[in-house]
């Protein structure tokens, strides 16, 4: 699942989706953000009052309508997480159906993080190796999202909350995120445009929500295990004991006995 993300938007940069665009008027930068920090994150929506796109900083964590205040929200976090929403279940889910039909958005990203599990030869247990994943020639790319306006009944404050839509992993991501074999639903510009249109039928919503980006469009690199506190979290790091992704998990550099 996608729980760690990065973003790098510079002032003056233009986000384009089809014929619509949004010029960035402030720097938005985070090398590593954990969804479990429940921070604000940039999303793109259709602007009903303009021909351009609407960029908004929204709360990363889909908050269902039956949660009434912050105390209930904190209690719910002990039972389930709503940082991600499975594309296969969007329209069957009581929590996500209405948003999937009426409130779809684009979550902006410059790269995300996942863990590959591997048991080195001679080790007693599997180790988790972090990877940083980007899209070739796309400094900023588009993840499918759904959003939910939520009002804290105690304070009266209203915010937009959102979840990143995920799909079954493609071949490459199945090797990286090899436990759960999931990935964020990453959309081309044309699919991103379609995703945020009002008139999508249920069949098309399901198709786009479960879209798998081609392996060839992605770049993946192993990084240091302490990347979350590193000054250079996205820097490539090679583990001597870890076979490359195009080798079998049981690969050994040792010569066989003859």
Question: Model regions: which residues?
Answer:
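Short linear sequence motif anchored by a di-proline
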Residues: 1-258
